[in-house]
Every structure is written in structure tokens, then in C-alpha cells.
Design a protein with these regions (language model features):
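Juxtamembrane/interface motifs at transmembrane-helix termini
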Residues: 32-34, 95, 128
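N-terminal glycine-rich flavin-associated loop
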Residues: 85-102
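Short secondary-structure boundary/hinge segments and terminal tails
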Residues: 38, 64-65, 91-96, 115
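A generic structural signal for solvent-exposed, polar alpha-helical segments
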Residues: 49-50, 93, 125
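Glycine-rich, Trp-frequent "lid" loop and neighboring beta-strands that shape
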Residues: 63-64, 101-132
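Amphipathic, small/basic residue-rich leader segments at the start of a protein or domain
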Residues: 1-87
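General N-terminal targeting signals
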Residues: 22, 72-74, 91, 100, ...
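DPxDG-like acidic metal-binding loop motif
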Residues: 73-78, 97, 129-132
Length: 132
């Protein structure tokens, strides 16, 4: 884990890696290439039980109170395991909401895994319709 700075970060990476191996085996990855995955995916509750959805969020909203570095470690392990599904975009959405307002009430459902977040990047591009 190149971004793990402390031994706790290495422990976190090891824990997430073990979770990924256990709940997202290669058969799940191959199946996800051929068929749509369940929503939420089968690993969603296991990730919630481990506190991963809210790892980077304030304890005030049910998160673990860690930061973006710890989230990056989790995302790196999910990426290394090629975990399909909405975990990464949901984590990014919750980080964006939290950056704007760390006590936003929507974060409670995201931290617990009861909700799945998404985000869209606004390019600032606009259009004007002409005609009917």
C-alpha cells in the first residue's frame, strides 16, 4: 500500500483487502461483466458493517471520523480488487457533500450504507434552444 503512512493505514488496507477477497471473489467480477449486478451489491452490507461507507465522515453524522487519506486507502483496495458497483461514486459523493457541510443530514444515510450517493460534474457548459 504505497499511500499507507502509519501502521494503522497498513492494517486498514489489509482489512479492506481481506473483505474484498471474501465478499467480492473473482466469480462476482466475471459475472458483473456479463450481467447487471444487484443494487445494492451483495458486498454493500459487509462494507457498512465494517464502517467503510462513513470512514471519512464526521461522527456527528454516524461516520468514523477519519479523513480523506483513510478513504483513499479504502478506494485503492476496492480499485485493486476491481470491485463493481456504486461504492466509489457513493464515497466520492459523500466526501463532496461533507466538504461543503460536514453535518449535512444526508450524510447519515450515506455513512450507514442506507443510501447510495452519486455525483455529476458540471462543466459550466450551457446551451440555448432555438426554434420549436
Amino acid at each position: 500500500m504505497p499511500i499507507a503512512i502509519l501502521s494503522e493505514h497498513s492494517d486498514l488496507a489489509d482489512s479492506v483487502r481481506d473483505l474484498v477477497k471474501r465478499v467480492v471473489p473473482s466469480e462476482v467480477l466475471h459475472e458483473a461483466l456479463e450481467t447487471p449486478i444487484a443494487n445494492p451489491p451483495t458486498y454493500w452490507k459487509a462494507a457498512a458493517d465494517q464502517g467503510l461507507h462513513g470512514l471519512h465522515l464526521s461522527e456527528n453524522v454516524g461516520g468514523q471520523g477519519f479523513g480523506i487519506l483513510e478513504l483513499a486507502i479504502v478506494l485503492a483496495e476496492f480499485g485493486h480488487g476491481a470491485v463493481p458497483g456504486p461504492f466509489v461514486p457513493s464515497a466520492i459523493a459523500s466526501a463532496l457533500i461533507s466538504a461543503n457541510d460536514p453535518d449535512d443530514k444526508r450524510l447519515e444515510a450515506l455513512a450507514s450504507g442506507d443510501a447510495i450517493g452519486a455525483y455529476a460534474i458540471d462543466s459550466g457548459l450551457t446551451a440555448t434552444r432555438h426554434g420549436a
